[in-house]
Design a protein with these regions (language model features):
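N-terminal Rossmann-like NAD(P)+-binding subdomain of aldehyde/semialdehyde dehydrogenases
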Residues: 1-129
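Short Gly/Pro-enriched turn/cap motifs at secondary-structure boundaries
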Residues: 5, 135-137, 285-286
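Residue-level signal for inorganic ion chemistry
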Residues: 22, 58, 169, 202, ...
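A structured beta-alpha segment of the ubiquitous adenosine-cofactor-binding alpha/beta core
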Residues: 134-135, 202-223
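Hydrophobic residues in well-ordered beta-strands that form the structural core
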Residues: 174-175, 206, 249-251
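ALDH superfamily catalytic-core signature
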Residues: 190-195, 219-221, 229-329
Length: 329
């Protein structure tokens, strides 16, 4: 969705396959898309329109959008199956995303003024006579926010970035990860069709982002979620460096859980440890950025921990073995 219209690439595109059945779900390509025009549209159309609103007005739009999307979530759940997600996985992604919109809507009305700017701190007197004073204020950036998202949360990943961006009064261009972009596109399409936010406030690129970063300036920002290598590559872009473009990177993390030597088998702490690690190994097939990827267990407890893990994981395997291609749990 670029510069106020839906765009279909002239190229054949790359097929996106159902993770369970291997059937083609969609094709993806951004070939021929004028990325400079998208950035210009955000600056000249989306930015002025959303900056006209106060923080409270933007917050109310976030709430309206969250309510609207929640009413459509069953169709998003159905499409989410093709990404390889179970219903529980989808709840984290879809309901979690909508919940984020609700959360920022509430924070915007509770914590921010019903104004277009924020007064930052007290007035500072900078002259002996008191006639020379200064006051800091915070206003929206005049550029565009570019959101480059990861594959594991096609809905929540988009909405967790959009919520604070739109609340701040900045237009955004969303670039979802390729393999699950069809789910992002479905939710985004519902957002556009709702006409809740003004035109130009949000745009979408499915496929390569091409030279988009080359069209950014010092009033723009990039929020990236993905691998550290890709993040370093993007951050070293000549335009990003020369124009001092704000760049926020959420990359590889290694979370661990440690079992204390006093948490004996049968204790509440032992059961909690095993339960949480097993949950993190299976939720989103262990691909959450916050997943526990390493455990530290006292040597004399390893056998007990492995036995309990095997029991929990074995139960999951037996339940899933007889499911249809699309799991529902």
């Amino acid at each position: 969705y670029a510069a106020g219209r839906w765009y279909a690439a002239s190229a054949e595109g790359h097929p996106l396959l159902d993770a369970a059945t291997g059937e083609e779900v969609a094709r993806i390509s951004s070939a021929g898309l004028d990325l400079g025009a998208m950035a210009h549209h955000a600056r000249t159309v989306g930015g002025p329109a959303i900056r006209e609103l106060t923080f409270h007005e933007r917050a109310l739009l976030l709430k309206e959008l969250a309510t609207h999307l929640t009413g459509l979530k069953d169709e998003f759940y159905e499409l989410s199956l093709s990404t390889g997600a179970t219903r529980r996985d989808s709840m984290i992604d879809i309901d979690g995303g909508f919940g984020t919109l609700f959360s920022y809507a509430g924070k915007g009305r509770r914590e921010l003024p019903n104004a277009r700017f924020i007064v930052d701190g007290a007035t500072e007197v900078m002259g002996k006579t008191g006639t020379f004073v200064g006051q800091h204020i915070m206003t929206p950036l005049q550029g565009v926010a570019v959101h480059i998202n990861a594959f594991n949360f096609p809905v929540w990943g988009m909405l967790e970035k959009l919520a604070p961006t739109l609340l701040a009064g900045v237009p955004a261009i969303v670039k979802p990860a390729t393999v699950t972009s069809y789910l992002t596109e479905a939710v985004f399409r519902a957002m556009i069709e709702s006409r809740i936010f003004p035109e130009g406030a949000i745009q979408l690129i499915c496929g390569s982002a091409g030279d988009l970063l080359d069209h950014l300036d010092c009033q723009c920002a990039v929020a990236f979620t993905g691998s550290a290598d890709t993040g370093r590559h993007l951050k070293s872009n000549k335009t990003i460096i020369e124009n001092s473009v704000r760049f926020n990177q959420e990359a590889d993390s290694l979370n661990f859980s440690m079992l204390g030597p006093d948490a004996a088998p049968g204790s509440d702490e032992f059961d909690l440890f095993v339960k949480e690690v097993a949950k993190e190994m299976t939720s989103k097939t262990g691909q959450k950025c916050t997943a526990i990827r390493r455990t530290l267990v006292p040597g004399n407890m390893v056998e007990d921990v492995m036995k309990d893990w095997s029991r929990r994981r074995g139960g999951c395997a037996r339940r899933r073995r007889w499911r249809r291609p699309h799991p529902s749990a």
